[in-house]
């Protein structure tokens, strides 16, 4: 009954349509929005789910000439005699009330966020189940969005497993290091990850203006001693920083920092970007962390008096990351694949001993959040429909 129309009428000189639903809720729809979203074949290409009507052809002051309704549809005639039909459930879903808009945004963008620290219970699923079953793939990606990290177990100890996950999502994110890349100690390494030393907490590739959203790391070979992985929930740490030191939070969320990456791998590259280390949306919510101390440039485009306060704020942020309450430490085993949110989590690695041969080998890849979210929405629909 929630999507059943009790009454529909034009208001405000026919510039608004009001619907009273059988659940006693009311919805208002501007006439210009209704005309813009006419679903007829002249105005909408159903095969592409895309609007054909041009803004140039839209009268922004249009009113409704005629309106009739039944329980499941509204029928509108416009001043030029154009005719539109709107389904009740389509209209109810797009109600302009604050509550309805918030509900739809939750459905579209999966905003639920579960913060964590050292108490994290690492979400774990079977690698083959994720590849084979939609229910498991949906659990994987929905948990990745909510918690920020999922471990998959049972992969092989051969390269190629992250490419399978890329196909499961859609496709991988190509960078200057290739579609996939090998994390192992190398002579004359072109990245600090390709050494045996400790890696401090960082996000990958802030030197790009659009850093990769999701990272995949498959353990092929693991060293006996050292090489433990460390992760921290950057969004949780930001909350703590804002509470403990609002000035430091303000500095890191307003100061543009230069990042650079220069070298040769998939091809030769010379990359430069500018990011705020803590990136906020228009509501002041943290949406991305951009921080890699190795690729933070020596160039710093700020007035001289702002340099020392920036370093003080950054030090406070990093100290919070490294607190025992914030970080979670674990060791990957051969066949494990760690998948995590590169915009939210910062990750690091403890040092390990170099031998005469490669003692630790991970294969990595990236995915874009747009690709991941696309697959997540499709999987939810399949699971809910029982397909």
UniProtKB/Swiss-Prot annotation:
Disulfide bonds: none annotated. It catalyses: 4-(trimethylamino)butanoate + 2-oxoglutarate + O2 = carnitine + succinate + CO2. Its main location: cytoplasm. It comes from the Eukaryota. InterPro entries: AlphaKG_dependent_hydroxylases, GBBH-like, GBBH-like_N, GBBH-like_N_sf, TauD-like_sf, TauD/TfdA-like. Signal peptide: none annotated. NCBIfam families: carnitine_bodg (TIGR02409). Belongs to the gamma-BBH/TMLD family. Catalyzes the formation of L-carnitine from gamma-butyrobetaine. This is Gamma-butyrobetaine dioxygenase. It comes from Homo sapiens (Human).
């Amino acid at each position: 009954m929630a999507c059943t129309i009790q009454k529909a009428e034009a208001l405000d000189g026919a510039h608004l349509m009001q619907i009273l639903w059988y659940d006693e809720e009311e919805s208002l729809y501007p006439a210009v929005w209704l005309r813009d979203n006419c679903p007829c074949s002249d105005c909408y290409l159903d095969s592409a789910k895309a609007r054909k009507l041009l803004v140039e052809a839209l009268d922004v002051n249009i009113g409704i000439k005629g309106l009739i309704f039944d329980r499941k549809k509204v029928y509108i005639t416009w001043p030029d005699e154009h005719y539109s039909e709107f389904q009740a459930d389509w209209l109810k879903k797009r109600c302009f009330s604050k509550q309805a808009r918030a509900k739809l945004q939750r459905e579209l963008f999966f905003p639920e966020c579960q913060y964590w620290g050292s108490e994290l219970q690492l979400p774990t699923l079977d690698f083959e189940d994720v590849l084979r079953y939609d229910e498991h793939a949906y659990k994987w990606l929905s948990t990745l969005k909510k918690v920020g990290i999922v471990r998959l177990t049972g992969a092989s100890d051969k390269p190629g497993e992250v490419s399978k996950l890329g196909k499961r999502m859609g496709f991988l994110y190509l960078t200057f290091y290739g579609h996939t890349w090998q994390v192992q100690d190398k002579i004359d390494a072109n990245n600090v990850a390709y050494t045996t030393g400790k890696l401090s907490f960082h996000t990958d590739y802030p030197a790009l203006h659009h850093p990769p959203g999701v990272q995949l790391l498959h353990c092929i070979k693991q060293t006996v001693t050292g090489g433990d992985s460390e992760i921290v929930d950057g969004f949780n740490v930001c909350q703590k920083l804002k509470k403990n030191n609002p000035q430091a939070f303000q500095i890191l969320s307003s100061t543009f920092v230069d990042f650079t990456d220069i070298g040769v791998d998939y091809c030769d590259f010379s990359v430069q970007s500018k990011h705020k280390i803590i990136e906020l949306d228009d509501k002041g919510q943290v949406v991305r962390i951009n921080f890699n101390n190795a690729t933070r440039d020596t160039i710093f485009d700020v007035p001289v008096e702002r340099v020392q306060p920036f370093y003080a704020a950054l030090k406070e942020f990093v100290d919070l990351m490294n607190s025992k309450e914030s970080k979670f430490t674990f060791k990957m085993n051969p066949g494990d694949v760690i998948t995590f949110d590169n915009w939210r989590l910062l990750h690091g690695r403890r040092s390990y001993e170099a031998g005469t041969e490669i003692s630790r080998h991970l294969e990595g890849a990236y995915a874009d959040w747009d690709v991941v979210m696309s697959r997540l929405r499709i999987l939810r629909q399949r699971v809910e429909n029982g397909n």
